[in-house]
Amino acid sequence: MHLLVATAVSVERDAVARAFPAPGTEVSRPGITLHRLPDGWDLLAAGVGPARAAASTAAALTAAALDGRPYDLVVSAGIGGGFAPEAPVGSLVVADAITAADLGAETADGFLPVTDLGFGTVTHLPPAPLVRAAAEATGARPGTVLTGSTVTGTAARAALLRERHPGALAEAMEGFGVAEAAAAHGVPVLELRAVSNPVGPRDRAAWRIGEALAALTDAVGKLAPVLESWKPHER
């Protein structure tokens, strides 16, 4: 298996790397720097937000294809907000749907997703057998992970998202961008989030970033054997 794990920032990438005993090496490719681990794992701090994450992931996918060793799976991983009470701080969520929370248009009758306008997609579905296996291995709860360009900071916005996306368990800023790039290359995608804060009013004192990063490291350690043994045709 050749795997790409895309995080937003370097502290998340480093949390993933700590799940592996062997050190990695830095590999430069046009526009990106990969942290390459043994056994076919490449880690990428892809940047914050869906656009930057999509661009960086696409660059990594293209470089791998040109090198003659395309990726078999792309994983969007990191910390994120959790919708209480289903996804409390410190818990894990694995996406059974990766959804753009706000890609569409506002109308007098409410929000219309871009698909209702006749364009694109708003949801990518990771392989269901892989989602189940990941949930069993890590204890993560499967559910929708939303991607937005703006982090929720009010109770009103959190309630609106819950109304619009009833199956949502977590919110982050990169998963949909990573999934769009993977889909363009025909590569399956998975998203794993460790919950660092509740989705709702912005209260930095309530954030538990260190706890979430530790949970991410632990989860990746448990997930690695599942991913390494997974066959891409098992979709």
Swiss-Prot record:
Pathway: Quinol/quinone metabolism; menaquinone biosynthesis. GO terms for cellular component: cytosol. Transmembrane segments: none annotated. Gene3D superfamilies: Nucleoside phosphorylase domain (3.40.50.1580). It comes from the Bacteria. One of its GO terms (molecular function) is methylthioadenosine nucleosidase activity. Coiled coil: none annotated. InterPro entries: FL_hydrolase_MqnB (IPR019963), Nucleoside_phosphorylase_d (IPR000845), Nucleoside_phosphorylase_sf (IPR035994). Keywords: Hydrolase, Menaquinone biosynthesis. Disruption phenotype: Mutants require menaquinone for their growth. Its EC number is 3.2.2.26. It catalyses: futalosine + H2O = dehypoxanthine futalosine + hypoxanthine. It is an enzyme of class 3 (hydrolase). One of its GO terms (biological process) is nucleoside metabolic process. Belongs to the PNP/UDP phosphorylase family. Futalosine hydrolase subfamily. Catalyzes the hydrolysis of futalosine (FL) to dehypoxanthine futalosine (DHFL) and hypoxanthine, a step in the biosynthesis of menaquinone (MK, vitamin K2). Does not accept aminodeoxyfutalosine (AFL) as a substrate. HAMAP family: MqnB. This is Futalosine hydrolase. It comes from Streptomyces coelicolor (strain ATCC BAA-471 / A3(2) / M145).
